[in-house]
């Protein structure tokens, strides 16, 4: 029996009914071969090298939100095409492709949930929709989430995974950087916590605005975080970049973020921080002082 035949027999015997060899996943970092159910159980973290893979929005929801507590808001908001923008495709076409791919109308889900028992407003970026880019709808959803947090005296968690501002909306998308930053300033004035969670990747206009305005900034291990890409920076300055540049570990070492938290500990960490920094959560009587 040749190796190819042996491998087919091995995977066929290991797989249960209805499964196939495609259910084996290779780690992008260490090339370890893992069974897909093991990967799911580990929140898409390699058990061999601890590499944190990119995961779907639905997996993020399951990982962070207490079961059955998420109430989505503003799901009906959809981007328009005020500039009739066309690159290789029209913007309208890209929006439709994003809808078909994700089943959602924008790159952001916003809503209210409980995280380890603590009620909070939450905003989750979806990289599968146009690279998680920030457009006018996404900015509006963030502002509305801030408004609800202010109204209900809750904290806010924003999970970023984005390539930056959406070029197809030009100045409209760039305006969201100032718009979201101004809204978050009101949350800060109200002494309500904003926790910014940076995941791979968090780049461009997102990193240059609300992603780094958190009262507490947390990153996942190995996340790529920055403004311009490393290659562009290297070509611009004409010099080599430090080892590990634009990684979460590099940012922590240089004091730009507060902590790096593994995925399996993220929910408890967020719940503890929200409970500790929001005085209204445990003491609702403070609302009347």
Swiss-Prot record:
| GO BP annotation list | fatty acid biosynthetic process; malonyl-CoA biosynthetic process
Q: Does the keyword Cytoplasm apply?
A: yes
A Pfam short name: Zn_ribbon_ACC
Keyword Cell division in annotation: no
GO cellular component terms, alphabetically, are: acetate CoA-transferase complex
Compartments reported by the entry = Cytoplasm
Query: Coiled-coil ranges per the record?
Result: none
Q: Give residues annotated as binding Zn(2+).
A: 27, 30, 46, 49
State the protein's purpose: Component of the acetyl coenzyme A carboxylase (ACC) complex. Biotin carboxylase (BC) catalyzes the carboxylation of biotin on its carrier protein (BCCP) and then the CO(2) group is transferred by the transcarboxylase to acetyl-CoA to form malonyl-CoA.
Q: Which family does it belong to?
A: Belongs to the AccD/PCCB family.
HAMAP family xrefs: AcetylCoA_CT_beta
Official protein name in the record: Acetyl-coenzyme A carboxylase carboxyl transferase subunit beta
> Organism source for this protein?
Wolinella succinogenes (strain ATCC 29543 / DSM 1740 / CCUG 13145 / JCM 31913 / LMG 7466 / NCTC 11488 / FDC 602W) (Vibrio succinogenes)
């Amino acid at each position: 029996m040749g190796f190819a035949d042996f491998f087919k027999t091995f995977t066929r015997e290991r797989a249960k009914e209805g499964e196939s060899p495609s259910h084996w996943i290779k780690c992008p970092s260490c090339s370890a071969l893992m069974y897909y159910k093991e990967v799911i159980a580990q929140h898409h973290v390699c058990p061999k090298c601890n590499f944190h893979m990119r995961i779907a929005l639905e997996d993020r929801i399951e990982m962070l939100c207490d079961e059955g507590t998420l109430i989505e808001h503003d799901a009906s908001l959809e981007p328009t095409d005020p500039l009739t923008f066309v690159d290789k495709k029209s913007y309208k076409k890209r929006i439709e492709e994003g809808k078909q791919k994700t089943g959602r109308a924008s790159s952001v889900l916003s809503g209210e949930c409980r995280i380890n028992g603590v009620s909070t407003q939450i905003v989750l970026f979806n990289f599968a929709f146009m690279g998680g880019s920030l457009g006018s709808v996404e900015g509006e959803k963030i502002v509305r989430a801030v408004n609800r947090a202010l109204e209900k005296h809750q904290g806010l968690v924003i999970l970023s995974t984005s390539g930056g501002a959406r070029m197809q909306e030009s100045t409209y998308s760039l305006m969201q950087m100032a718009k979201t930053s101004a809204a978050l300033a009101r949350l800060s004035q109200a002494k309500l916590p904003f926790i910014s969670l940076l995941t791979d990747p968090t780049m461009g206009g997102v990193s240059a605005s609300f992603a780094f305005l958190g009262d507490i900034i947390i990153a996942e291990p190995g996340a790529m975080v920055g403004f311009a890409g490393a290659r562009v920076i290297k070509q611009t300055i004409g010099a080599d970049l430090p080892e590990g540049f634009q990684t979460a570990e590099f940012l922590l070492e240089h004091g730009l973020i507060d902590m790096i938290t593994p995925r399996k500990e993220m929910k408890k960490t967020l719940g503890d921080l929200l409970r500790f920094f929001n005085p209204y959560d445990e003491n609702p009587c403070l609302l009347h002082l």
